[in-house]
């Protein structure tokens, strides 16, 4: 399983359970979470990322469409944006989520 696939699986588990700790284990201590297209973040550091997900959790699971694009499970045939992960030493150092409107 790729790091990206593992991240998405753990993200989706967090959506279902509210427990984000398995997903957070994949992040470096200084990981940055950045959203583009919505007025949220950025969040710097694993603790800040964890608090962001705990205080404002997503309400739907991710579905990977290809190497970069994702959809929400509720509308799995409609691309919702792009997910970019930067890896360092086998862990995620940066998460960049692009929200886009596709026609």
Regions found by a protein language model. Give the residues of each.
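C-terminal and inter-domain tail/linker signature
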Residues: 1-103
């Amino acid at each position: 399983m790729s790091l990206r696939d593992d991240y998405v699986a753990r993200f989706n588990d967090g959506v279902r359970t509210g427990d984000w700790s398995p997903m957070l284990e994949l992040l470096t201590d200084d990981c940055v979470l950045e959203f583009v297209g919505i007025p949220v973040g950025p969040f710097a550091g694993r603790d800040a990322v964890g608090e962001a997900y705990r205080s404002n959790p997503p309400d739907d699971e991710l579905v990977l469409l290809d190497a970069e694009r994702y959809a929400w499970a509720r509308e799995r045939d409609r691309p919702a944006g792009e997910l970019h992960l930067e890896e360092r030493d086998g862990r995620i150092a940066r998460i960049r989520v692009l929200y886009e409107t596709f026609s």
